[in-house]
């Protein structure tokens, strides 16, 4: 199938629908896996930062991310296609493979849901979205960004605990958490 054929709309579909899969070569972590394999792991967070995996502390968050990337990548976790708006106003489509970030985001969010109040979660989501938008638009030096950073950093003080995750081929599931700051246990 050539590139023109890939971009041609399929019969019976609107012109906006494209069925274009990324080539297997586009993925760095594609590995031969046992289809029935699973691995249970735990992620340790302190003040919102990933500090360990399976109880092992890492010298830096980057080192923990690298380890998680290798372990989750072996399951081909984290592949996706993102469609979004570019700064010049057109739609863009990008394929990516991000095993560790997707797991960390989901695990971190579960921990936040347990240790932050409803109002903290609401404002963190909204301020986080606005921060991301301004950053994407190149507005890092905008003074309000420092205000947002102060609020976001303040919310992370109690985001401390362990989150449990099960890795399976092409997917993962966050299965539980423990935190001394869990508002459900108070």
Regions found by a protein language model. Give the residues of each.
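Nucleotide-activated chemistry modules centered on ATP-dependent adenylation/adenylyltransferase
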Residues: 1-186
């Amino acid at each position: 199938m050539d590139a023109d054929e890939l971009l041609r709309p399929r019969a019976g579909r609107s012109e906006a629908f494209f069925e274009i899969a990324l080539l297997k070569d586009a993925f760095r972590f594609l590995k031969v896996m046992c289809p029935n394999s699973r691995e249970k792991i735990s992620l340790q967070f302190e003040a919102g930062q990933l500090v360990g995996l399976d109880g092992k502390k890492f010298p830096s968050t980057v080192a923990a991310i690298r380890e998680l990337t290798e372990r989750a990548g072996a399951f081909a976790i984290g592949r996706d296609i993102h469609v979004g708006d570019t700064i010049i106003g057109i739609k863009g489509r990008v394929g990516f493979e991000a095993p560790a970030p997707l797991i960390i985001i989901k695990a971190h969010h579960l921990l936040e849901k347990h240790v932050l109040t409803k109002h903290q979660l609401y404002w963190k989501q909204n301020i986080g979205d606005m921060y991301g938008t301004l950053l994407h638009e190149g507005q890092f030096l905008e003074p309000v960004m420092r205000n947002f950073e102060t609020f976001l950093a303040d919310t992370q003080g109690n985001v401390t605990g362990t989150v449990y995750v099960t890795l399976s081929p092409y997917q993962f599931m966050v299965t539980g958490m423990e935190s001394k700051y869990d508002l459900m246990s108070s």
